[in-house]
Amino acid sequence: MKLIVVSGRSGSGKTVALRVLEDLGYYCVDNLPVSLLFQLVAELRGKYDQIAVSIDVRNLPATAEDLVSILDEIRQHQDLQFSSFFFDADNATLLKRYGESRRLHPLSRQQFTLAQAIRQETDLLSPLSSSADLRIDTSHISIHELSEQIRERVLGKKEHELVMVFESFGFKHGIAKDADFVFDARFLPNPHWIAELKPLTGLDEPVQRYLQSQPDVVKYINQLISLLETWLPQLERNNRSYVTVAIGCTGGQHRSVFIAEQLANHFLVLGKNVQRRHRTLEKLHAPG
């Protein structure tokens, strides 16, 4: 099991970090008391392989020694791949961020001014800062740059992996509303009008052979591939987690299924993270 503890001064980027880790498949828990870390790990063991926990200044043990002891014990746990990330920014940047957000600092309720609260937080979080495996100063980087740094550390590569979802649907059942791209295949030759192909789907070999023999179908698929390959790098750089490409035909049984499969197979061969979904076929085979 992998466990990442996210900490840092308030306003430095912990929330962004936790959101990125969630996108990367981590089960995330916000503001967990340090004393409950082992209980959480025991509860989630076998259910999740990757856990991320954020800790802020309100959830620390009573003493710095207790905090160090808990962290040391976690690091020595044989069944855990433990790492800790600490986020920080200079005092001027934190003051500016709080001024813009108009949020209260977690220590403000202790009658501290904002500047005093920021300094006090520095002292309280010192054990977490000094023992962190990764420290990121967010003073002069954007949210997107911070996200990329976290992904690079977690994945071992700079760009995060975009999930490409290819789905088919039938216009007569309603357009796919969750799609980023919608392409219409209703103008292409329709296997529905061929008696022996009508009861089949785009997943069946006779339908596939028929559509592969149609020049317009092949041309359309190649043009869609060219379009997606042209803009895919930009989508990846834009910090997208998913891009959904929907292909529609009249009923969602033949042409759209075939084209969605062809696109999915093409990008799968290129090493992309691909998912496929056939809305009409799922309805036809749904229980009840």
Curated annotation (Swiss-Prot):
GO terms for molecular function: ATP binding; GTP binding. The keyword ATP-binding applies. Gene3D superfamilies: P-loop containing nucleotide triphosphate hydrolases (3.40.50.300). Belongs to the RapZ-like family. This is Nucleotide-binding protein Tola_2941. PANTHER family: RNASE ADAPTER PROTEIN RAPZ. ATP binds at residues 8-15. Transmembrane segments: none annotated. GTP binds at residues 56-59. It holds the Pfam family PapZ_C. Keywords: ATP-binding, GTP-binding, Nucleotide-binding. Displays ATPase and GTPase activities.
